[in-house]
Amino acid sequence: MQARNIGLDVSVPEKECTDPHCPFHGNLPVRGQVLTGKVISTAMTRSVVVAREYQQYIPKYERKATKIKKYHVHVPDCIELRVGDTVRFAECRKLAKTISFVVVEKVKQ
């Protein structure tokens, strides 16, 4: 099965899969936001938790505070991830109650 073009400038995984929720080998369209974050948990089946850090200015204290936003992200079978990997993930339709993003590329380990 040949990987399809998903419309993003990302590298296609070398491994093939039969996951219907894979943007490359299945029929899941990606749209909207494309974000980058760090994998903090791989305990779920075919899914991971990805954290993004950002700074928010607090006027009362005239300081910036670091905050963390967590995303539940689906991982296709053709992409292998471990805790600590940096990944690029894209928005898609809802796959579960809390999952509406899918991993499209592993940036670095």
UniProtKB/Swiss-Prot annotation:
GO biological process: translation
Domain of life: Archaea
Keyword annotations from UniProtKB, A to Z: Ribonucleoprotein, Ribosomal protein, RNA-binding, rRNA-binding
Pfam family, one: Ribosomal_S17
SUPFAM superfamilies: Nucleic acid-binding proteins (SSF50249)
Record flagged with keyword rRNA-binding: yes
GO cellular component, one term: cytosolic small ribosomal subunit
Matching InterPro entries: NA-bd_OB-fold, Ribosomal_uS17, Ribosomal_uS17_arc/euk, Ribosomal_uS17_archaeal
Statement: the UniProt record of this protein carries the keyword Ribosomal protein: yes
GO molecular-function term, one example from the UniProt record: structural constituent of ribosome
Homology family: Belongs to the universal ribosomal protein uS17 family.
Subunit structure, interactors included: Part of the 30S ribosomal subunit.
HAMAP family membership: Ribosomal_uS17_A
NCBIfam families per the UniProt record, alphabetical: PRK08572.1 (NF006345), uS17_arch (TIGR03630)
Function summary: One of the primary rRNA binding proteins, it binds specifically to the 5'-end of 16S ribosomal RNA.
Name assigned to this protein: Small ribosomal subunit protein uS17
UniProt lineage: Archaea, Methanobacteriati, Thermoplasmatota, Thermoplasmata, Thermoplasmatales
Gene, per the UniProt record: rps17
